[in-house]
Regions:
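A short acidic, Gly/Pro-enriched loop at the edge of an enzyme's catalytic core
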Residues: 95-106
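C-terminal lobe and adjacent flexible extensions of AdoMet/dcAdoMet transferase-like proteins
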Residues: 203-245
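Class I SAM-dependent methyltransferase SAM/SAH-binding core
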Residues: 54-96
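A short SAM/SAH-binding and catalytic strip from SAM-dependent methyltransferases
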Residues: 104-120
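Conserved class I S-adenosyl-L-methionine
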Residues: 1-40, 42-49
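A short glycine-rich, Lys/Arg-flanked "PGG" loop and its adjoining helix->strand segment in the class I
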Residues: 123-135
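SAM-dependent methyltransferase
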Residues: 140-209
Length: 245
């Protein structure tokens, strides 16, 4: 049986549901992040879990050499339309090694982590990213803030997008957040159901995972405007780490 994310991320309904999700906010966050980091022109950047490549394209347009990787073959096929001499895309599983000491920066945006069943798989993913960075390379991971997500969870919601109905149910246990999505479409004989599962990783968890792979967190922010991180009040957990080994 395939893991949930392989089926869901390759589903046309996934892209239908999330296509326009906060794109303006995402683009503004990336602009502010680049202003904060001050990368040199031509810096090599790795966009981990790049999806269809829209954010990789934005980074490339700022004068950087960008490589995007994603597990979804369909997403990468679509991203390939943007390829240039300084923008590259590959279908790749972040749990498996790739480049070694190659990139100046690596990014994992918008909670594109924490999907795997075992801690070994999570550690392997962080290892892949750490190994891909040059010494002193920078890794930015943007994750949900567990405590905020618990306190502000909307347990039931419904969305209608272009005639497709999405019934969304959210809950959590001690280790994971769950999101069940029931899809009703006239073209379907019966509703489709997908369930997302994301690990409840704290700042302490990431600190340990990064340290194990030779990276150290240097800065932490609590939203896309780079406000200070507050364990209960911040909607996001944005970590900037440096490869120190």
């Amino acid at each position: 049986m395939l893991p949930w994310f392989k089926n869901w991320f390759n589903s046309p309904y996934y892209h239908h549901l999330y296509f326009n999700r906060d794109e303006k906010e995402a683009a503004e966050f990336i602009n502010k992040l680049i202003d904060h980091l001050h990368p040199l022109q031509g810096s090599r950047m790795l966009d981990v879990a790049c999806g269809k490549g829209r954010h990789s394209l934005q980074l490339s347009g700022k004068g950087f050499d960008v490589t995007g990787i994603d597990l979804s073959e369909d997403s990468i096929k679509e991203a390939l339309q943007y390829e240039t001499e300084t923008l590259h895309f590959y279908q790749h599983d972040m749990r498996l090694p790739c480049w070694i000491n190659f990139f100046d920066y690596a990014f994992n945006f918008f909670t594109s982590f924490g999907y795997f069943n075992t801690q070994r798989e999570n550690d392997n993913s962080i290892r892949t990213i750490a190994q891909s960075l040059k010494p002193k390379g920078i890794f930015v991971l943007d994750y949900l803030n567990v405590h905020y997500a618990e306190d502000h969870m909307v347990h039931q919601s419904e969305k209608e997008i272009d005639g497709v109905n999405f019934l969304i149910t959210k809950w959590y246990d001690e280790q994971h957040f769950f999101k069940k999505i029931m899809i009703e479409d006239e073209q379907l004989k019966e509703p489709l159901v997908f369930t997302e599962k994301v690990s409840k990783f704290s700042l302490g968890d990431f600190t340990d995972m990064f340290a194990y792979q030779g990276m150290q967190i240097k800065e932490v922010f609590g939203d896309y405007n780079f406000k200070n991180y507050h364990v209960k009040k911040s909607p996001r957990l944005v970590m900037i780490a440096e490869k120190i080994k």
